[in-house]
């Protein structure tokens, strides 16, 4: 066995090399095939996995739970009311306790420093299910979905539309640069990515040959796009900025006019979900009443169109998370990459 992944944590995309990320994407596709064919793959038989959630989730919790069970492991959910991270007990102390009881830890919350402390002090692999800075497990699902549709990654162009400072935008930018994917951020100047994130991405882009573009010009942003990607306009914990964001981001909505500007009939649309594309939710109705906006980051027309791949993308969360857990905890033979 070669120790390529065994015992390693996945806290941000930059933790792994291009070859390692490509391997995990391909390994995910393999595990997806095994799942579809009903072939058992209990690589984590007898392992116990802690799922720590400061932030609520549908897809991340469901993906980690089903992935762990498919791998033969036992997942244990610990929500915000079950854990005392930094409140009544330090993150260091919590990590040391959990590391003696569990074989691996997933964390979804606010602070990147917290997930880093869990990895530093637990002594077991820790996987970032989302923080305010990064969303690495989402990226594997996103780029697996892209590869499934185009058969490759290098040289493609992905355009992210909306809040260029959020965790998904950060992760798309850096991961794309590592993998040789051209990444355009289509966003108002007020929400351009932080300079240090852009600098990091540009460094990777020089190695991979990818192009990075940050712009508020729609024509420049989407010309030749293969993938249009968007996310919610207001992230968890920023609800007080809703009115400001609705007004600021309305011109960056993914609608059919923007799709047509790309001039690519094979284009696909991605969204990490949940999406506010209609008023069929309490939240959507409330926004419509307060702000007169019935569709936010994406129109219902695009969301339900032939371009949409977001439900494939959501399913791929499970397969890619499974690959990360198996590779870092399963004592598998993985040729050096």
Swiss-Prot record:
This chain's source organism reads Streptococcus pyogenes serotype M6 (strain ATCC BAA-946 / MGAS10394)
Q: Which domain of life is it from?
A: Bacteria
The entry marks the following residues as binding L-ornithine, namely 167, 231, 235-236
**NCBIfam families given in the database record:** orni_carb_tr (TIGR00658), PRK00779.1 (NF001986)
Q: What class of enzyme is it?
A: transferase
- So what does this one do? Reversibly catalyzes the transfer of the carbamoyl group from carbamoyl phosphate (CP) to the N(epsilon) atom of ornithine (ORN) to produce L-citrulline.
Name of this protein? Ornithine carbamoyltransferase, catabolic
Q: Where is the signal peptide?
A: none
| Molecular function terms from GO | amino acid binding; ornithine carbamoyltransferase activity
Q: Which PROSITE patterns match?
A: CARBAMOYLTRANSFERASE
């Amino acid at each position: 066995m070669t120790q390529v992944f065994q015992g390693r944590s996945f806290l941000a995309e930059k933790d792994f090399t291009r070859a390692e990320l490509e391997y995990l994407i391909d390994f995910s596709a393999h595990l997806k095939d095994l799942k579809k064919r009903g072939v058992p793959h209990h690589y984590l038989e007898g392992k116990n996995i802690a799922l720590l959630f400061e932030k609520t989730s549908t897809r991340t919790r469901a993906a980690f739970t089903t992935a762990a069970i498919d791998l033969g492991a036992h997942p244990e959910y610990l929500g915000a009311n079950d854990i005392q991270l930094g409140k009544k007990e330090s993150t260091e102390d919590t990590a040391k306790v959990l590391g003696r009881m569990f074989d691996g830890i997933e964390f979804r919350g606010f602070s990147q420093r917290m997930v880093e402390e869990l990895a530093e002090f637990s002594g077991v692999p820790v996987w970032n299910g989302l923080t305010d800075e990064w969303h690495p497990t989402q990226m594997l699902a996103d780029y697996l979905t892209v590869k499934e549709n185009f058969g490759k990654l290098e040289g493609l162009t992905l355009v992210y539309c909306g809040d260029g400072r959020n965790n998904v935008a950060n992760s798309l930018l850096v991961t794309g640069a590592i993998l040789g994917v051209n990444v355009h951020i289509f966003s108002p100047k007020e929400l351009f990515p932080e300079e240090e994130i852009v600098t990091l991405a540009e460094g990777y882009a020089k190695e991979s040959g990818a192009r990075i573009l940050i712009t508020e010009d729609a024509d420049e942003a989407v010309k030749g796009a293969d993938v249009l990607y968007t996310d919610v306009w207001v992230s968890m914990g920023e609800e007080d900025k809703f009115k400001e964001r609705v007004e600021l981001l309305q011109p960056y909505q993914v609608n059919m006019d923007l799709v047509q500007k790309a001039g690519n009939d094979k284009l696909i649309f991605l969204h990490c979900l949940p999406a506010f594309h209609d008023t069929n939710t309490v939240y959507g109705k409330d926004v419509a009443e307060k702000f007169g906006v019935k569709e936010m980051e994406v129109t219902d027309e695009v969301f339900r169109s032939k371009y949409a791949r977001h439900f494939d993308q959501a399913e791929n969360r499970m397969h890619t998370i499974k690959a990360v857990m198996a590779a870092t905890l399963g004592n598998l033979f993985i040729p050096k990459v």
